[in-house]
Design a protein with these regions (language model features):
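Conserved SAM-binding motif I beta-strand of class I
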Residues: 88-95
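C-terminal substrate-binding/active-site "lid" region of AdoMet-derived donor-dependent transferases
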Residues: 164-231
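Conserved acidic residues
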Residues: 64, 152-153, 177
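S-adenosyl-L-methionine
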Residues: 1-64, 101-154
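Conserved class I S-adenosyl-L-methionine
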Residues: 61-75
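Conserved Rossmann-like nucleotide-cofactor binding loop
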Residues: 98
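Conserved SAM-binding loop of SAM-dependent methyltransferases across substrates and taxa
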Residues: 73-87
Length: 231
């Protein structure tokens, strides 16, 4: 573990500078869960997520209960909680079980706040986007938790380029839900199985009854596209 006096402890130094507990949470994710945050905190990832948060703040709409799909380490959740956005709670779903403890650690303050944030290991194809029931393993009680039911108002997916059966997934979202989507045109990455050429193609693949925002962000190697609206 890096000592607080060590100048290599960037998270510790930022905590002292800003008094923002998020930096301590990031530090704990690295120290206690061996989290590699180099990609999650890359300029491309952070600029894309900051763009999303900024546009939501400009729209000034209530997000209510948020389902963050393919949420990874839920750095976006941390940014949303620190924003001006009106949020009741966030549930972050990812099929990779290694994400759970890291995401919960990064958002530890909201986890402790009656689970205002909670990460769940689950395939986003298996979620009921109308009224979803979920459980997690409780180490404290050595058993599964009692079932919890959440009804999402907002569905966010910033990893649409990774969703192989995107049409099938999108069809699961009920009409009227607020949807925030990001994809890109970075076709060179093998894991990017659902890239789009531009915003026009993206809008065709994800039709909405009311579009609140359509835009693109120029990044060094690719363009990222974003749609915000009601399905």
């Amino acid at each position: 573990m890096i000592e607080w006096k060590d100048d290599n402890d960037i998270y510790g130094r930022m905590l002292v500078l800003t008094n923002n507990p998020l930096f301590n949470n990031l530090r704990n994710a690295v120290d206690n869960h061996d989290a590699d945050l180099s990609d999650a905190l890359s300029w491309g990832q952070l600029k894309s997520k900051r763009w999303l948060v900024t546009e939501l703040e400009s729209l000034d709409i209530s997000l209510g209960t948020v389902f963050l799909c393919a949420g990874w380490y839920a750095t976006l959740a941390a940014m949303l909680f620190q924003s001006k956005c009106n949020i009741d709670k966030i549930r972050s779903f990812d099929i990779d079980e290694s994400c759970l403890q890291i995401a919960d650690t990064i958002n530890r303050n909201q986890v402790k706040e009656d689970w205002k944030f909670k990460s769940i290991t689950q395939d986003i194809m298996d979620i009921d986007y109308n009224k979803h029931k979920w459980q997690i393993w409780s180490n404290t009680n050595n058993r599964m938790s009692y079932p919890i039911t959440d009804m999402p108002d907002t569905i966010i997916n910033t990893s649409c380029e990774h969703i192989e059966n995107f049409d099938e997934w999108y069809a699961k979202i009920p009409s009227g839900k607020l949807v925030i989507l990001q994809s890109n045109n970075f076709f060179d990455v093998d894991e990017h199985v659902n890239c789009v050429e531009d915003c026009t193609q993206f809008r065709i693949t994800a039709p909405m009854t009311t579009q609140l925002y359509v835009g693109e962000l120029e990044l060094p190697k690719y363009k990222r596209f974003m749609l915000i609206g009601y399905k």
